[in-house]
Structure formats: structure tokens, C-alpha cells
């Protein structure tokens, strides 16, 4: 009877009491009407979407390094390889400063621009660029170019009027840095170029002043490796007006070749154009020397100009007007507004005069000494005391003293000519 009592509620449903599973049936209408086996497949389909999101982030993580690589490295494998060697380069050189930039990594824009210049100077050859960068870093460590500008001073008689630095602006406000070498201002060739180390330091100091004006350490944009225009380059002007000694002077030849060699190694890709103005015909040897040490990309930037007054014509109107009048512009003379290295007057002549006086002073002193010695002899009172005593002992003493007196006089006589001989 108890089972029959349970059947009435089951009888209320259209299914017989044998089908106890209709209790699960209400869950089926929530899904599409498919086979009864869908109940067992549903847990598998529900687990699949849970695993999918766990696999997707792994694929994204693997793709992140390639996506985060800067374009200037992704598009330039040689530059990327160059940066891979940078830690070893800095370790080998023992120095990390180049042109005011502390070399760091590929995320530092000023560092990237420096690396691009060294790589371009070697036409993309990573090994050659590495060797040159190491040499340049070692050279800067030894030479300390920053100190040559900040603390060193140079002879005004040797280098005064020989080098200048100017900065002009074009129509867009962009600055153009120009270094000037006025070789016609050299007064004494051997004094200016005779000491090669001194001349090179002066020339490096002028170059470093120009490099500072480029402001490479303040760069915020990576320069285009393949672009012809480089915002971190300067102009150089060499004026040979009234120069007639270049053909035969060996000191100038040696200084010029050494400067070209050092600058090609230590300052690659910093030159936009170089103008040789008022050039005499005998200077062919200098251009031949430049081709030996400099690349074709650099020598193609050289422009000889026979008349210096035509220099300003090489530039657009807003810029050429700022050039000095002597070079075809309307600007002031270099001596009036250009900058230069720290020059000081030579104190050497005054020092030499004082040395001569100091050497002569001791020679005069001995001449007076023998004159004073005879004056001291009468001060010896024992000679007079024995005269007052009538004893015979006193006579003996006087005879001994009189015997000693000639010896003292002889000594005075022999010593007197000695100073005279020194004076001669």
C-alpha cells in the first residue's frame, strides 16, 4: 500500500513509475534536443573552454620579445649584433664615454646614434666597427678631450687666430655648427707645428667644442641609418689664404697627417661637408693623404674652392648671410664674434730673464767677500796685548803670530782671484 501511495504522484505524470530518470529530464530542455549521450559529453565540452585561455597567454608571451624589439634593431641585423657586443667592447676599452654620451644599451637613444655612426663609418661591417670603437674609447681615456676644453690653455702666440667655432641658424631654426682653421694666421711655422703633441691637443680641443654644440647627449630620436641627412654633423672650413709653405715644410706635413689619422679614428661620421678655400695648387699632397685614411663616403664631402669669397654661395639665403663678409656673407668677422679655445699669453720671456738674474747674483757675491776678509784681520786684539807686557814670553808669542800672519795673507791672495775667474 505504501508503494501504491507513492504511485499516485507518479501517475500524475505521463510516464510510468519505472522511469525514475524523468527527474533529470528538466535539465535537458536547457540544451538543444540531441541524443541522450550529450549528458556525458557536456562535461568535456565545458572543460575545453577552460583550458583554451590557459594556452593562449603562453603563445602571447613567446611572441612578446619579437614585438618589443625596436624597429631600428629589427630592420638592421648588423646594428643588433653590434649592440650584442657592446658589453665586451666597453670592458675591453675600460671606458664608456663617447662625445659626451655615456654608452649604455639599445634602449638609450644617444647610445644608439653613436653606434650607428661607427657602423656607418665601416659600411656595416660589425667587426671593423667594433675595433674602431674600442680604439676610439681607449684614445679618449688617454687623451681626456673634455679636460682639453675645460681646464687646458694654449699659447696665444702659437695658436691665436688659427681656429674658431661658429653656430648659424637656417630658416627652420636648425643650427649649423662650423669650425674654422685659418692657416694663414700662423706666425711661425716651426713653433706652431713643431710640437706635434701640443698642436694635436689644440686641434682636438677645438673639435670637442664643436661636438658639444651638436648636443648628441640630448638626442630623443634615433637617426635613420639609411638616410642621407644626419642632424648630428658639422661643417669645417680650412682657409689657406697667404699660405705658401705647405710644399716644403716637414713639420706641417707631419702634423696634418697625424691629425687626419686621429680624427678619422676618433670622430667618424661627424662631418657633413668640408670646404678648402683659397687653396693653392701645390696642396695636392694633402688631398692625397686624406684619401689614404678616410673612406669614400667622407672624401666625397670635400669641396676645394679657389676663392674664399664664394663660400657663402654654397648655402641657402638665411644661412649664407650669417657668414663673414670675407667669405661672401654679411656677418661679422671671425675675430669679432666667433669662439675659440682658451688662449693665454706666453710667460716664458719673463721667466728666462728672472733665471738669468738669479744666475748672475751668486757670481757677484763672491767678489765682495775677499774685500771684507782683510777688514777682519785688525780686529784680532791679541796682537796689541803682547806689546804692553815686557816679558820674554810675549816676544815669543809675537814672533809666532807674525809668522802666522803671512799665511793668512797668502790665503787671502789666493782666494781673491777665484771669484774673478768665475766672473769671466
Curated annotation (Swiss-Prot):
Biased segments, Basic and acidic residues type: 32-41, 353-398
UniProt xrefs under InterPro entries: CRAL-TRIO_dom (IPR001251), CRAL-TRIO_dom_sf (IPR036865), CRAL/TRIO_N_dom (IPR011074), CRAL/TRIO_N_dom_sf (IPR036273), Sfh5 (IPR042938)
Entry similarity comment: Belongs to the SFH5 family.
GO molecular-function terms, A-Z: metal ion binding; phosphatidylinositol transfer activity
Name of this chain's protein: Phosphatidylinositol transfer protein sfh5
Residue stretches of biased makeup (Low complexity): 42-56, 411-424
Listed GO CC annotations: cortical endoplasmic reticulum; cytosol; endoplasmic reticulum membrane; plasma membrane
An individual GO BP term: regulation of exocytosis
Residue ranges annotated for the CRAL-TRIO domain, each copy included: 152-335
Alphabetic keyword roster: Cytoplasm, Endoplasmic reticulum, Heme, Iron, Lipid transport, Membrane, Metal-binding, Microsome, Transport
Topological type in the membrane: Peripheral membrane protein
Domain of life of the native organism: Eukaryota
UniProt catalytic activity: a 1,2-diacyl-sn-glycero-3-phospho-(1D-myo-inositol)(in) = a 1,2-diacyl-sn-glycero-3-phospho-(1D-myo-inositol)(out)
SMART domains listed in its UniProt record: SEC14
Region (Disordered): 1-74, 348-424
Cofactor requirement: heme b
Residues annotated as binding heme: 183, 203, 238, 240, 274
Role according to the record: Non-classical phosphatidylinositol (PtdIns) transfer protein (PITP), which exhibits PtdIns-binding/transfer activity in the absence of detectable PtdCho-binding/transfer activity. Regulates PtdIns(4,5)P2 homeostasis at the plasma membrane. Heme-binding protein that may play a role in organic oxidant-induced stress responses.
Gene3D superfamilies the record matches: CRAL-TRIO lipid binding domain (3.40.525.10)
Principal location listed in the UniProt entry: cytoplasm
Compartmental location: Cytoplasm; Endoplasmic reticulum membrane; Microsome membrane
Amino acid at each position: 500500500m505504501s508503494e501504491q501511495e507513492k504511485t499516485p504522484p507518479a501517475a500524475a505524470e505521463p510516464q510510468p513509475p519505472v522511469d525514475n530518470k524523468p527527474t533529470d529530464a528538466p535539465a535537458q530542455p536547457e540544451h538543444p534536443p540531441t541524443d541522450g549521450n550529450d549528458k556525458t559529453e557536456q562535461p568535456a565540452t565545458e572543460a575545453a573552454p577552460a583550458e583554451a585561455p590557459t594556452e593562449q597567454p603562453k603563445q602571447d608571451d613567446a611572441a612578446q620579445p619579437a614585438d618589443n624589439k625596436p624597429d631600428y634593431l629589427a630592420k638592421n641585423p648588423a646594428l643588433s649584433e653590434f649592440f650584442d657586443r657592446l658589453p665586451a667592447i666597453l670592458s675591453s676599452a675600460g671606458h664608456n664615454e663617447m662625445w659626451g654620451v655615456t654608452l649604455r644599451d639599445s634602449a638609450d637613444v644617444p647610445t644608439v646614434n653613436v653606434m650607428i655612426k661607427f657602423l656607418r663609418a665601416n659600411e656595416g661591417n660589425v667587426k671593423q666597427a667594433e675595433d674602431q670603437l674600442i680604439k676610439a674609447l681607449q684614445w679618449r681615456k688617454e687623451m681626456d678631450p673634455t679636460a682639453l676644453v675645460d681646464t687646458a690653455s694654449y699659447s696665444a702666440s702659437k695658436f691665436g687666430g688659427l681656429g674658431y667655432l661658429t653656430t648659424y641658424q637656417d630658416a627652420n631654426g636648425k643650427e649649423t655648427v662650423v669650425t674654422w682653421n685659418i692657416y694663414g694666421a700662423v706666425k711661425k711655422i716651426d713653433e706652431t707645428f713643431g710640437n706635434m703633441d701640443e698642436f694635436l691637443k689644440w686641434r682636438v680641443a677645438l673639435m670637442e667644442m664643436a661636438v658639444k654644440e651638436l648636443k648628441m647627449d640630448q638626442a630623443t630620436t634615433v637617426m635613420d641609418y639609411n638616410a642621407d641627412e644626419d642632424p648630428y654633423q658639422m661643417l669645417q672650413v680650412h682657409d689657406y689664404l697667404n699660405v705658401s709653405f705647405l710644399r716644403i715644410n716637414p713639420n706641417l706635413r707631419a702634423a696634418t697627417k697625424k691629425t687626419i689619422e686621429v680624427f678619422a679614428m676618433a670622430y667618424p661620421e661627424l662631418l657633413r661637408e668640408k670646404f678648402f678655400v683659397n687653396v693653392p695648387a701645390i696642396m695636392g699632397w694633402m688631398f692625397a693623404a686624406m684619401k689614404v685614411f678616410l673612406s669614400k663616403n667622407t672624401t666625397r664631402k670635400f669641396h676645394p674652392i679657389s676663392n674664399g669669397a664664394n663660400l657663402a654661395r654654397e648655402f641657402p639665403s638665411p644661412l649664407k648671410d650669417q657668414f663673414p663678409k670675407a667669405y661672401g656673407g654679411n656677418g661679422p668677422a671671425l675675430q669679432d664674434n666667433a669662439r675659440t679655445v682658451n688662449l693665454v699669453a706666453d710667460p716664458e720671456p719673463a721667466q728666462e730673464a728672472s733665471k738669468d738674474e738669479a744666475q748672475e747674483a751668486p757670481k757677484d757675491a763672491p767678489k765682495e767677500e775677499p774685500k771684507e776678509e782683510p777688514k777682519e784681520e785688525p780686529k784680532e786684539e791679541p796682537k796689541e796685548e803682547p806689546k804692553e807686557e815686557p816679558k820674554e814670553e810675549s816676544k815669543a808669542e809675537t814672533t809666532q803670530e807674525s809668522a802666522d800672519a803671512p799665511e793668512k795673507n797668502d790665503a787671502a791672495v789666493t782666494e781673491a782671484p777665484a771669484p774673478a775667474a768665475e766672473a769671466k
